[in-house]
Amino acid sequence: MVVLKGGAWKNTEDEILKAAVSKYGKNQWARISSLLVRKTPKQCKARWYEWIDPSIKKTEWSREEDEKLLHLAKLLPTQWRTIAPIVGRTATQCLERYQKLLDDLEAKENEQLGLISGEGAEAAAPVNDPNSRLRFGEAEPNLETLPALPDAIDMDEDEKEMLSEARARLANTQGKKAKRKDREKQLELTRRLSHLQKRRELKAAGINIKLFRRKKNEMDYNASIPFEKKPAIGFYDTSEEDRQNFREKREADQKIIENGIRNNEMESEGRKFGHFEKPKPIDRVKKPNKDAQEEKMRRLAEAEQMSKRRKLNLPSPTVSQDELDKVVKLGFAGDRARAMTDTTPDANYSTNLLGKYTQIERATPLRTPISGELEGREDSVTIEVRNQLMRNREQSSLLGQESIPLQPGGTGYTGVTPSHAANGSALAAPQATPFRTPRDTFSINAAAERAGRLASERENKIRLKALRELLAKLPKPKNDYELMEPRFADETDVEATVGVLEEDATDRERRIQERIAEKERLAKARRSQVIQRDLIRPSVTQPEKWKRSLENEDPTANVLLKEMIALISSDAINYPFGNSKVKGTANKVPDLSNEEIERCRLLLKKEIGQLESDDYIQFEKEFLETYSALHNTSSLLPGLVIYEEDDEDVEAAEKFYTNDIQRDLAKKALECNKLENRVYDLVRSSYEQRNFLIKKISHAWKALQTERKNLTCYEFLYNQERLALPNRLEAAEIELSKMQQIEAYAQQDYARVTGQN
């Protein structure tokens, strides 16, 4: 049988839903719906969030809520899920209230226009009826938002079964395993009883079986848990409170014991002296009077509350007693004048001339403000409802229609909350009572008001005159117009315009830096090749010794050596290598210009070109011999030949150069270590990635080899199957023909047998 779930909610189902939500929470709707036979999880969830939830407001709609609802419906049309939390109601309540406001105003307008009258008006559904929007034969679509139906006296069997099952499941606080737990408990009880019966029978037979007792300082690992630490009962440590309770209990026990001993001593003394009276039965612990204790606690609470109250500090009065007396006298004078005029025959004429000073106008609004209908105007709710009806009746202006003329006023579009217009009522105006004279019917302050009005008019005239003077100082407008033919810019004009443009500071700075860098490059190019290549320069300059050691019979060679020594000394002094200090003096060789350097190069090329090939070969041979002779000496350091005449100079030079070389070697070693560490830091990630890629490639290669083997096997199988397929097909066809023949013979036999019968 198919069971259709749904329908109106009953009181029993609501109560089951409340209890289920309190136990299972607001997320397990499938489990909750299993308790309700006729409801789905979606319906249970909707019922909770639309009706049963305690946070849902079911009171009458206030004016502020109506204004907020209409304002949000105007800003967010048909977005009721978004509007509901802002208004503080459910989405269904907001929609129903919105429709009700529109229906009420529409019915009111129809009644005013006379569209509903006579029998039609009496037959029409009431406005407040929630079912008036339903047609005949239609069902309520939102049954979850309606009150629950009362339970029937005679429930159906399925309802009774549902109720009993829900009661049993909700009463089960031990979870789904309650039956198994009860069964295990019964089995444990049976096992214990059987064990006792067994011990009793063995004891009757003379066999005593004692329970195992643990020896001292030993542990039974089968019965206890080693190194067990029991967790705390709660979130906080209450050991100190337990100790304090134990101490208090022990002191109370001691007092009871002492009181009992004293009573026994007094009883024995009374018996000794013969005037013993039977003591009254008293309790061991004196019971306090409950009412007196409650009264005492109440007084303590009141005293504590009184101590919490602060002293009332009122501000000082703004109106003195003299001013109050003057106001009272003015009121009495007006009352006396009115009483005197009322006694005369023509009291009406004089009464109209006198003001009434008994009723004081207040700056605060009344408790019951005047509604818009009493003032002859419509309130914001009615205006918004009428505007919404007009929007619903007409097409939107986005479809090409004219804009709908809406009624001005309402809640506006300034924000999420509706905006209220300023109240024009004199009773609610905050400045309706001007300071000391709330009413001036007798024109007591007419002179002061007139003087103030004249002063303000005079100030306005002065301000207007000053404004006119300032406007007169403005230059007169020129209305000379001249039409010119547009002229397109030529290339020359573009170049002129570009030249006129001011150069940017960043471009100028970059241009200056480039110019300085170019000058430095040209200056470095004019220096020697040792400086350009940043080669090592000597740290000690001794031009005279160098000249003596390199003197030659050829005057041309001597000139060249002299220039070379001067250039080496100048480079060592003017451009020291690194941060080393150079010992010795030398004359600075001036830098040559670019033209002079180019001229020298041309002369060298010309001179070298004039040399014959044999001379050039001889020159190269002599150069190599000289170079090898200088660098293959027995001395530890090259270049010490110049110190052969002086042993002390040789020893000092060796020591100096040795220390410098060792220091440079140590420095270079540190730099190399730093560079190696830096290179390792930079390359480590790449090295790890390389290893990872190598492993990945190896795995991929193995997988590729495996797939190739599989492909070869499958191709071989394919070829074998393709070759064997015709044979198998032929065998199957032969088998089929045999089966057909056998079946034909069987049919003939069957026909023959049936024909004979």
Swiss-Prot record:
Q: Which InterPro entries match?
A: CDC5L/Cef1, Cdc5p/Cef1_C, Homeodomain-like_sf, Myb_dom, SANT/Myb, SANT_CDC5L_II
- Spell out the SMART domains in the cross-references: SANT
Gene Ontology molecular function, alphabetical: DNA binding
The entry's localization annotation reads: Nucleus
Q: Report biased composition (Basic and acidic residues) as residue ranges.
A: 271-307
Report keywords, A-Z: DNA-binding, mRNA processing, mRNA splicing, Nucleus, Repeat, Spliceosome
Please indicate if the UniProt record lists DNA-binding as a keyword: yes
Q: Name one GO biological process term.
A: mRNA cis splicing, via spliceosome
Q: Where is the HTH myb-type domain?
A: 1-56, 57-106
Q: Where is this region: Disordered?
A: 271-319
DNA-binding residue intervals: 29-52, 80-102
Source domain of life: Eukaryota
Matching PROSITE patterns, A to Z? HTH_MYB
Q: What is its main location?
A: nucleus
- Gene Ontology CC annotation, any one: cytosol
The record's annotation in Pfam families points to:
Myb_Cef (PF11831), Myb_DNA-bind_6 (PF13921)
Spell out the subunit comment.
Belongs to the 40S cdc5-associated complex (or cwf complex), a spliceosome sub-complex reminiscent of a late-stage spliceosome composed of the U2, U5 and U6 snRNAs and at least brr2, cdc5, cwf2/prp3, cwf3/syf1, cwf4/syf3, cwf5/ecm2, spp42/cwf6, cwf7/spf27, cwf8, cwf9, cwf10, cwf11, cwf12, prp45/cwf13, cwf14, cwf15, cwf16, cwf17, cwf18, cwf19, cwf20, cwf21, cwf22, cwf23, cwf24, cwf25, cwf26, cyp7/cwf27, cwf28, cwf29/ist3, lea1, msl1, prp5/cwf1, prp10, prp12/sap130, prp17, prp22, sap61, sap62, sap114, sap145, slu7, smb1, smd1, smd3, smf1, smg1 and syf2. Interacts with sde2.
Function statement: Involved in mRNA splicing and cell cycle control.
Q: In which family does this protein belong, per the annotation? A: Belongs to the CEF1 family.
Q: Could you tell me what this protein is called? A: Pre-mRNA-splicing factor cdc5
Organism of origin: Schizosaccharomyces pombe (strain 972 / ATCC 24843)
Q: What is the phylogenetic placement of the source species in the record?
A: Eukaryota, Fungi, Dikarya, Ascomycota, Taphrinomycotina
